Design a protein with these regions (language model features):
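Structured core elements
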Residues: 6, 27, 56, 133, ...
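A conserved acidic, glycine/proline-rich C-terminal tail/linker
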Residues: 505-531
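Structured, non-catalytic alpha/beta "coupling" segments that mediate domain-domain communication
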Residues: 54, 64-71, 323, 526-550
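Catalytic cores of soluble metabolic enzymes centered on carboxylation/carboxyl-transfer
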Residues: 236, 275-506, 513
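Short acidic-glycine loop/turn motifs at beta-strand connectors
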Residues: 150, 192-197, 256-259, 294, ...
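Short, low-complexity Ser/Thr-rich regulatory SLiMs
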Residues: 178-180, 190-194, 253-257, 336, ...
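N-terminal beta-alpha lobe that positions the nucleotide/phosphoryl donor
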Residues: 1-251, 255-274
């Protein structure tokens, strides 16, 4: 679009990709976000010092901060987003519920007014019935939310929820509504210009979450039919018009197991998962944001926005699923992203990047597109298999396991999916014996070939002309896995790359590629079908992760 950009950076981000990609960059302060990226005055000062005309708030906290939006406009700059008034109204969940009701949107039954204290909370809970959900009027990300199953829990839940909310958002207002078991999370992307035009895009499903934060998204959704899809889109546009909204926004709904849907909230910004919508429409939503902010009308009307195919996105985060998804830190020592038809990677890091304690754990997004859901899913699996990151623990293998899970493949998902199928970050379903055998084969081959290379390197050099190659011999191993032992008998050699391997009493015929140990990825052809594995060397152990059929 020919727009020059100015980036801001903190002390620890002076070598970041966003700094390198911008035309200019301004140092904004120390690592702590409150003293740099969230400091409103410093951001505005940086913009004015470089002669900027507008500020794009990204999709962080300031993108939904009405005070910041107001300060930007007062400084004579354009805020690329809705007005401060719209942000204030829709950012208040109680006010947003009232607005949604006024345009005819269904809401979850409950008490959509601020609770005065514990006594009112107890009395109101009796009227609504259990289980119920306590929610803060401000904020997001699941902070302050509590599921309450009985009267004995309500007092402690209200007190702890209000305390957390006050600390996080400086707002102690709480409300409550009926808890919807196993809901699905559906959202509608809207765009509104300054001329009264509003359009909606195909829905996105964001039901795969951990700690109320999304990790896998897709569009369209299997959860809704065409009439519901159309109604959701119309209600989202109606809500935006009522609020005098401009720019990009997302209206969120939940559906219950009977396919009833309810308004949840509206996010007054562009979502992290917006590439999913871009992949199914071939439209650039950030470009739309910029054109709207410049006063242009919407590039397309509703009838001109068409969806094709299916898209999925997986968020790659620096976190440890086995430790409650705690953030991890460190330097990225190896980094390679997948490529291919229908594959897009939005990344903020590279080899040498240092992941610190100061910012969000999101490192990259892998987005795939296919003619149908299964093709998009298969491309996502292949892309995750080809996503290579070392130096710190990430959730790559976890999200790969999620999209390979039989319930995900079948579309049987809800916001409880991770909790039900991956408690403590590990699958409930025990892998089939065949998969255990596959992992045993991968581990033994890695060990056997590495050992053979070492032995060969220690032999004296000798002419091989006129000598017959030695006949392949069988080698037997006992492999110790997690809580089990495998007797493995291996015949073959790396020269032919073909092996006959018996795991306990089951035989497999295996073809191997040229081993490239530095890649940590291994593709084996087992009984005629390709399987993908990832390896990790830890002290005297080889860890094998099964990444699925390819």
């Amino acid at each position: 679009m020919g727009i020059r950009t100015v980036a801001v950076y903190s002390d620890v981000d002076f070598r970041s990709l966003h700094v390198e990609a911008s035309d200019e960059a301004v140092h904004i302060g120390p690592p702590a976000a409150a003293d740099s990226y969230l400091c409103k005055e410093k951001l505005i000062e940086a913009a004015l010092s470089r002669g900027c005309q507008a500020i794009h708030p990204g999709y962080g906290f300031l993108s939904e901060n009405h005070e910041f939006a107001r300060m930007v406009v007062q400084a004579g700059l354009v805020f690329i987003g809705p007005s401060a008034e719209a942000i204030a109204q829709l950012g208040d969940k109680i006010a947003a519920k009232a607005l949604a009701i006024s345009v005819g949107a269904p809401v979850v039954p409950g008490h959509h007014q601020s609770l005065s204290g514990v006594e009112e909370a107890v009395a109101t809970a009796e009227k609504i019935g259990y289980p119920l959900l306590l929610k803060p009027a401000s904020g997001g990300g699941g902070r302050g939310m509590r599921i309450v199953y009985s009267q004995s829990e309500i007092e402690d839940a209200f007190t702890s929820s209000q305390t957390e909310t006050t600390k996080a958002f400086a707002d102690n207002r709480m409300f409550m509504e009926r808890y919807i078991p196993r809901p699905r999370h559906i959202e509608i992307q809207i765009m509104a210009d300054k001329h009264g035009n509003v359009v909606h895009f195909p829905e996105r499903e964001c039901s795969i979450q951990r700690r109320y934060q999304k990790i896998v998204e897709e569009s369209p959704s299997l959860a809704i039919n065409e009439p519901i899809r159309r109604t959701m889109g119309e209600l989202a546009c109606r809500l935006a018009r009522k609020a005098g909204y401009t720019g990009a926004g997302t209206v969120e709904f939940i559906t219950d197991e009977n396919k009833n849907f309810y308004f949840l909230e509206m996010n007054t910004r562009l979502q992290v998962e917006h590439p999913v919508s871009e992949m199914v429409t071939s439209l650039d939503l950030v470009e739309w944001q910029l054109r709207i902010a410049a006063g242009e009308p919407l590039p397309l009307m509703q009838s001109e926005i068409n969806a094709h195919g299916w898209a999925m996105e997986a968020r790659i985060c620096a976190e440890d699923p086995r430790r409650g998804f705690l953030p991890t830190v460190g330097m990225i020592t190896r980094y390679a992203t997948p490529r291919g038809k229908g594959v897009r990677v939005d990344s903020g890091v590279r080899a040498g990047s240092v992941v610190t304690i100061y910012y969000d754990s999101l490192l990259a997004k892998v987005i795939t597109h296919g003619e149908n859901r299964e093709e998009a899913r298969e491309r996502l699996v292949q892309s995750l298999n080809g996503f290579h990151l070392e130096g710190l623990i990430t959730n790559v293998d976890f999200v790969n396991a999620v999209v390979n899970h039989r319930h995900f493949v079948a579309g049987d998902i809800s916001t409880n999916f991770v909790e039900e199928n991956f408690p403590n970050g590990q699958p409930v379903d025990e892998p089939a014996l065949e998969k255990h055998h596959y992992m045993a084969i991968a581990a033994i081959l890695i060990y056997h070939v590495r050992k053979g290379l070492v032995v060969e390197s220690l032999k004296p050099m000798a002419a091989k002309i006129g000598r017959r190659p030695p006949a392949p011999t069988a080698t037997e191993y006992v492999l110790k896995g997690e809580g089990c032992l495998f007797n493995v008998r291996l015949e073959g050699d790396q020269a032919s790359r073909t092996w006959k391997i018996a795991v306990d009493d089951t035989s497999y015929y295996v073809e191997t590629p040229e081993f490239e140990f530095y890649r940590r990825r291994l593709k084996l052809k087992i009984n005629g079908r390709y399987q993908m594995f990832r390896s990790r060397y830890q002290e005297q152990h080889i860890q094998i992760f099964f990444c699925g059929l390819i």
